[in-house]
From Swiss-Prot:
Location in the cell: Plastid, Chloroplast
Claim: Transferase is one of the keywords in the record: no
Family according to the record: Belongs to the intron maturase 2 family. MatK subfamily.
Protein name in the entry: Maturase K
Keyword tRNA processing among record annotations: yes
GO MF entries: RNA binding
GO cellular component terms listed in the entry, alphabetical order: chloroplast
Organism field: Chamaecrista fasciculata (Showy partridge pea)
PANTHER family found in the cross-reference section: MATURASE K
Keywords, comma-separated and alphabetical: Chloroplast, mRNA processing, Plastid, RNA-binding, tRNA processing
């Protein structure tokens, strides 16, 4: 590990042509497979010693470059000792180390940018719940929203060129091109969408790197125009298109925007476009008319088609009013509703009522998809009626209760930001009764007899846990405690959302 740190320090002062030699370093594969330096995945699977591991990688790369090894029949795989685990073991072995190698320059860029901007590293900013206070503050004053599903890149060469434009390591990205095209040859009979799904499962680290970089490239262009939209009318298209970092090497993209986009730049003068994204889904919201949102929609479609060669139909991007439609984001249904309030005022002997209407962002738990997920996990049926969990019935009573409580705690932790708690109580009730039925099944008893023998206070933790946590935060403020428990709470320690 010390050798790896020294190598990273040397790389800070160099160009990014150091990536290709990293593929031949043993500790890269130790990092990739979470093994020690004396216990590499190459040594375990292929039976070679540490001294010859460098030679193994060289041989694998050489064989990958040979045309006759890119297409190998099933009979040949039986004769080849390298094909003992998977049919594409060549690329599988090297792609793991390659994924670690290509992450290095971008990690260095992130560290240097944080140091240069003197940004304090805060884990709270990483929480996906931190976006909801932003929605509460901004979306109450907005009128239109559009949820956009970022399409997957289909053309392999676009992925390679996009990644190569940021890191100048030609040899390394020639190898990346070989990985992708070899994998495409092995799965040429399936659809592009299915190919992406298969590739993401077989090479998750490399897929995440490529997809994140693809989204970053998309957002860099999109957010650049968003930030510059207030003075786009004053900026000539010639200066705008000279930014090679944002518009990478596709002449058709420049030609289309040079001819057709000049007449539409005027419509992008808007300082109230708000953007949020998690994984592949993004949200656009605006205060102005739907005409502006339509312009942004067609801009995104042209951006995907001309820059990434991805076809997207305009009908898949919907523009809705926040007051009439909900948008699905991060497991919540959110919309803006009117919250009327009446204030009584008295001046001397005259009193009158003042009706005040305020907009409020509502976050609602999608109860039907949640019940469907619980039914898939065998906690209830499709109607939401709790059932026992036979798989856990062989465990100890304490372990069974802990398993149910853990899932209840996670759901409660995430969905405490809901405007109403009725749906959350229903989910807790399903898990509570499922736990009781599982315990009764284990003891070969009925639910009624089991509860009668142990008392009605069993499993009260399902409903009292949040109150106990808040009582520790506000030990003396009972009114504040009750108000917070009835209201929504956003936790800043949630870093991912598993759909």
């Amino acid at each position: 590990m010390e050798e790896f740190q020294v190598y990273l320090e040397l790389a800070r002062s160099r160009q990014y042509d150091f990536l290709y030699p990293l593929i031949f370093r043993e500790y890269i594969y130790a990092l990739a497979y979470d093994h020690g330096f004396n216990n590499s995945i190459l040594v375990e699977n292929l039976g070679y010693d540490n001294k010859s591991s460098l030679l193994i990688i060289k041989r694998l790369i050489t064989r990958m470059y040979q045309q006759n090894h890119l297409i190998i029949s099933a009979n040949d795989s039986n004769k080849n000792p390298f094909w003992g685990c998977k049919k594409n073991l060549y690329s599988q072995l090297i792609s793991e180390g390659f994924a670690v190698s290509v992450e290095i320059p971008f990690s260095l860029q992130l560290i240097s940018s944080l140091e240069g901007a003197e940004i304090v590293k805060s884990y709270n900013l990483r929480s996906i719940h931190s976006i909801f206070p932003f929605f509460e503050e901004k979306f109450a004053y907005l009128t239109y929203v559009s949820d956009v599903q970022i399409p997957y890149p289909i053309h392999l060469e676009i992925l390679v060129q996009t990644x190569x434009x940021x890191x100048x390591x030609x040899s390394c990205f020639h190898l990346l091109r070989l990985f992708l095209y070899e994998y495409w040859n092995w799965n040429s009979l399936i659809t592009p969408k299915k190919w992406i799904s298969t590739f993401s499962k077989s090479n998750p680290r490399l897929f995440l790197f490529l997809y994140n970089f693809y989204v970053c490239e998309y957002e860099s262009i999109f957010l650049f125009l968003r930030n510059k939209s207030s003075y786009l009318r004053l900026t000539s298209s010639g200066v705008l298109f000279e930014r090679i970092n944002f518009y990478a090497k596709i002449e058709y993209f420049v030609e289309v925007f040079d001819k057709d986009f000049l007449s539409t730049l005027w419509f992008f003068k808007d300082s109230f476009i708000h953007y949020g994204r998690y994984q592949g889904k993004s949200i656009l919201a605006s205060k102005n008319t739907p005409f502006l949102m339509t312009k942004w929609k067609y801009y995104l479609i042209h951006l995907w088609q001309c820059h990434f060669y991805v076809w997207s139909q305009p009908g898949k991007i919907h523009i809705n009013q926040l007051s009439e439609h909900s948008f699905d984001f991060l497991g919540y249904f959110s919309n803006v509703r009117l919250n009327p309030s009446v204030v009584r005022s008295q001046m001397l002997e005259n009193s009158f009522l003042i009706e005040n209407v305020m907009k409020k962002l509502d976050t609602i738990i999608p109860i039907i998809p949640l019940i469907r997920s619980l039914a898939k996990a065998k906690f209830c049926n499709v109607l939401g009626h709790p059932i026992s969990k036979p798989v856990w019935a062989d465990s100890a009573d304490f372990d069974i209760i802990d398993l149910f409580l853990r899932r209840c705690r996670n759901l409660s932790h995430y969905y405490n930001g809901s405007s109403t708690k009725k749906s959350l109580y229903r989910i807790k009730h399903i898990l509570r009764l499922s736990c009781i039925k599982t315990l009764a099944r284990k003891h070969k008893s009925t639910v009624r007899v089991f509860l009668k023998s142990l008392g009605s206070e069993l499993l009260e933790e399902f409903f009292t846990e949040e109150k106990e946590i808040l009582s520790l935060i506000f030990p003396r403020a009972s009114s504040t405690l009750q108000r917070l428990y009835r209201g929504r709470i956003w936790y800043l320690d949630i870093f991912y959302f598993h759909q």
